[in-house]
Amino acid sequence: MQRIILIIIGWLAVVLGTLGVVLPVLPTTPFILLAAWCFARSSPRFHAWLLYRSWFGSYLRFWQKHHAMPRGVKPRAILLILLTFAISLWFVQMPWVRIMLLVILACLLFYMWRIPVIDEKQEKH
């Protein structure tokens, strides 16, 4: 029963993480890490799919090995975060929603700032 629950949570996390790529309020990284954790404990097949076949695979393998982001990925991720939040702030009219978005943005940027980076060239040596 626990295995089935972990698989369901894992797939739910994959869906939410994928939606998080385009929706600024949903963070991608924590959901994909949750999916990897769930699949590692419940399904070697789904875990292998996530690590080697999915769009997130190379980033997950890098995170699993180094607990860091590749140097070039971090600025692109931050730029995408800023762009999606700017679009949201442009369309939202309610002040309390704008404030909420700005607070979420600040927390997300702080989280991103704290993630260590490593050069991919340095990693290969």
Curated annotation (Swiss-Prot):
Annotated transmembrane regions: 7-26, 46-63, 75-92, 96-118
Keyword Transcription in record: no
Compartments it resides in: Cell inner membrane
Keyword Metal-binding (UniProt): no
Intervals, Cytoplasmic compartment: 1-6, 64-74, 119-125
Main subcellular location: membrane
Its membrane topology: Multi-pass membrane protein
Swiss-Prot/TrEMBL keywords: Cell inner membrane, Cell membrane, Membrane, Transmembrane, Transmembrane helix
One GO cellular component term: plasma membrane
Periplasmic topology ranges: 27-45, 93-95
Pfam families named in the record: DUF454 (PF04304)
Record-given protein name: Inner membrane protein YbaN
Name of encoding gene: ybaN
